[in-house]
């Protein structure tokens, strides 16, 4: 079983981790890190270390990133469907090997468009994006980093404009509810979001730079494979 070094965003995140109730594994599309081997490793780790776990994959908004990199809408949708299908296949196979049920375990952002809890948190985030220039700029910065990273992974590049960044930022905004308070959305009591890198926007949120708060029953952890020193902000 693969061992991971775990870093905590806050002391509260560490306390939630120590109770080992539930973890959400964040899996990014078009990110070389999330190959079949790594996806299997983190599922094994979650199964061994927590009472239960869920998996969060990108939603329809991930096509925005590809469109910003020059793909047509139809081509972007095709690539997203293929990538998500690939990731789901790896996840389902490993979940079964862990003797866990697949039902209600693998989620995408876009699965919750009609979820009242998701809608409420998302609306708060969008309102903040539209009224707080500092928050908006922080989201746009993350969008730029995501475009640069994914541009390398799909072997393409294009001039990035302010309009492009704002369109790409919809991906960031769609993910944020799961960082702030995933519990009512996925029906858990307390949980941690686990990812392979620090999240600068999340750090800014817990440092009270914006009028957004992480719920006390929600945490964020960074997983680093033992002996793997490549981790960086994305």
UniProtKB/Swiss-Prot annotation:
What Enzyme Commission number(s) appear in the record?
A: 2.3.2.22
Q: Where is this site: Could be involved in aa-tRNA binding?
A: 79, 89, 171
Q: Name one GO molecular function term.
A: aminoacyltransferase activity
Q: Which domain of life is it from?
A: Bacteria
The catalytic activity, as recorded, is: 2 L-leucyl-tRNA(Leu) = cyclo(L-leucyl-L-leucyl) + 2 tRNA(Leu) + 2 H(+)
User: What does UniProt list as catalytic?
Assistant: 28 (nucleophile)
The record lists substrate as bound by 171-175, 195, 200-201
Annotated positions for site Could have a critical role in the catalytic mechanism? 175
Pfam families on file: CDPS (PF16715)
Keywords in alphabetical order: Plasmid, Transferase
The family note in this entry says: Belongs to the CDPS family.
What does this chain do? It uses activated amino acids in the form of aminoacyl-tRNAs (aa-tRNAs) as substrates to catalyze the ATP-independent formation of cyclodipeptides which are intermediates in diketopiperazine (DKP) biosynthetic pathways. Catalyzes the formation of cyclo(L-Leu-L-Leu) (cLL) from L-leucyl-tRNA(Leu). Can incorporate various nonpolar residues, such as L-phenylalanine, L-leucine and L-methionine, into cyclodipeptides.
Q: What is the protein's name according to its record?
A: Cyclo(L-leucyl-L-leucyl) synthase
Species whose genome carries this gene = Staphylococcus haemolyticus (strain JCSC1435)
């Amino acid at each position: 079983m693969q061992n991971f070094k775990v870093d905590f965003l806050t002391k509260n995140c560490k306390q939630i981790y120590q109770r080992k109730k539930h973890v959400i594994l964040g899996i990014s599309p078009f990110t070389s890190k999330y190959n079949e081997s790594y996806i299997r490793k983190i599922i094994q780790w979650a199964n061994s270390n927590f009472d239960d776990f869920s998996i969060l994959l990108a939603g329809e908004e991930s096509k925005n990133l590809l469109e910003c990199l020059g793909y047509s809408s139809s081509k972007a949708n095709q690539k997203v469907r293929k990538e998500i299908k690939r990731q789901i296949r790896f996840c389902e196979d490993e979940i079964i090997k862990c003797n866990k049920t697949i039902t209600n375990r693998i989620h995408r952002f876009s699965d919750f468009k009609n979820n009242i809890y998701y809608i409420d948190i998302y609306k708060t985030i969008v309102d903040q994006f539209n009224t707080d220039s500092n928050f908006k700029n922080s989201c746009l910065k993350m969008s730029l980093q995501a475009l640069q990273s994914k541009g390398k992974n799909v072997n393409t590049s294009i001039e990035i404009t302010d309009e492009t960044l704002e369109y790409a930022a919809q991906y960031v905004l769609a993910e944020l509810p799961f960082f702030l308070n995933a519990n009512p959305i996925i029906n858990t009591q307390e949980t941690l979001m686990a990812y392979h890198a620090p999240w600068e926007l999340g750090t800014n949120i817990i440092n009270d730079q914006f009028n957004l708060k992480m719920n006390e029953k929600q945490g964020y952890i960074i997983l680093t494979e033992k002996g793997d020193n490549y981790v960086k902000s994305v």
